[in-house]
């Protein structure tokens, strides 16, 4: 482990927000294992939230947008604050193709350039909508779905694909606009996956991102999937993200007034495409198939479709229409009800996966990581990178995925 980062952590007071989250848990474990002489760790824990693209708009604004400015205001009141390290996501950059540079947002900037984002107006509109649905006597479930739809509509108005990345982008804007002299670093990881090496290879909490697809594929639930197989799957192990966070903090803790963005991913340094991942999954489950409830071996077979239009036609004809017919039969025949419920549940589960991953499986962008690469070169010159890995070039994707598929299954 390189001495600079270990020394940086010694006698430090660190506040970690969202401390019950996957990334934060790995960060806290890493800090304590590296430097037991850290002065204080304050861990902010709150009730669980659904951190997803489907979050209702008012909740997402409260957490991702105004939560960020609340942290900044708190940091300003601290005695001699050294750095505010804000974790965002690369997907705040939207769905545009090509090389995407590490650039922070200007206040009010939109992705499509058609409308200026007024964050206070967005909060007012969200509050008005929520109040309107309550006054109309809508149920909690109806209100939640309506607020999700409203958030998606607002996001797309400005060029963002979903509520989550839109509200995260607005959070970045507020930090940049109101930071004054506060040193701020924004870290934008790509899709965070299980550990590469620390605390041991393949660790992950629950089923996240790629792991859920692996399980549904292995169980034979995933019959078709929307994916451009030539698209790069930009994933990064969680321990590499945490290593980057600590290395970046150590490098910037004395930079007064800095406002830097770091992309932390693999697409620019060591890309892996979806076709490769599919082939790895296929090879694994051919050798080690799962066993179904009936005791029969499951042989997964997935139809991969590269465009959304073709996918909709295929799924409507192949699955949705037969399920709807089965639903009609279940009304007049009790024996068909369980069969209908089973197939309908599987179909909805698969469609939810597709909806969740659509912005990523058709994504044509490559995230530039010039700032991260500069820091890596600096650490390599000090012979530190070997012990404190942040370089995705060292990942052998075949080995990485075989361990993950084995653990997930």
Curated annotation (Swiss-Prot):
The keyword Lipid metabolism appears for this protein: yes
Annotated Gene3D superfamilies: NAD(P)-binding Rossmann-like Domain
Keywords on record: Lipid biosynthesis, Lipid metabolism
Keyword Metal-binding carried by entry: no
Entries under SUPFAM superfamilies matching the protein: NAD(P)-binding Rossmann-fold domains
Molecular function terms from GO: alcohol-forming very long-chain fatty acyl-CoA reductase activity
GO process annotations (BP): lipid metabolic process
Annotated family: Belongs to the fatty acyl-CoA reductase family.
PANTHER family: FATTY ACYL-COA REDUCTASE 7-RELATED, MALE STERILITY PROTEIN 2-RELATED
Stated name of the protein: Putative fatty acyl-CoA reductase 7
This protein's encoding gene: FAR7
